[in-house]
Swiss-Prot record:
Membrane-spanning parts: none
Purpose of the protein: Could be a nuclease involved in processing of the 5'-end of pre-16S rRNA.
Annotated PANTHER family: POLYNUCLEOTIDYL TRANSFERASE, RIBONUCLEASE H-LIKE SUPERFAMILY PROTEIN
Pfam families: RuvX (PF03652)
Annotated S-S bridges: none
GO BP field: rRNA 5'-end processing
Main localization of the protein described in the UniProt heading: cytoplasm
Organism: Legionella pneumophila (strain Lens)
CDD domains according to UniProt: YqgF (cd16964)
Keywords: Cytoplasm, Hydrolase, Nuclease, Ribosome biogenesis
Protein EC: 3.1.-.-
Record-given protein name: Putative pre-16S rRNA nuclease
Amino acid sequence: MPRGVYLGFDFGYKRIGVAVGQRLTCSASPLSTIEAKAGIPDWNTIQKVITQWNPQALIVGLPTCIDDRELYTTSAARRFAKQLHKQFSLPVHLVDERLSTVEARGYLFEQGGYRQIKKAEVDSIAACVILEQWLQQSE
């Protein structure tokens, strides 16, 4: 697997968390949260992020239930991944994102309690969790 920069996405109908990571350290950092309207991403902002970071691949979290059932957002996340590949001609990998939001909320709570938990930050931290999981699994 090539060393380099990777972008992770936590897809949601209202917000899409974005993180950047690298294979060398298998770590990721939150970048931003991109607004979406009824599940339609702001493709111009996504284009800017991809142009700025020039990633090797894109990693998208795939929401599923604890018992492996798919959620209503699962098919939307798959469509988002397909659109990313079609628009940017980059490899796109899907990662089981089970409990990534719970982990992100826990991290933010540890940093400053309940008041520290802001929805936009949760989404970008969840994208970090998703991306780091993929980086560690694909090594």
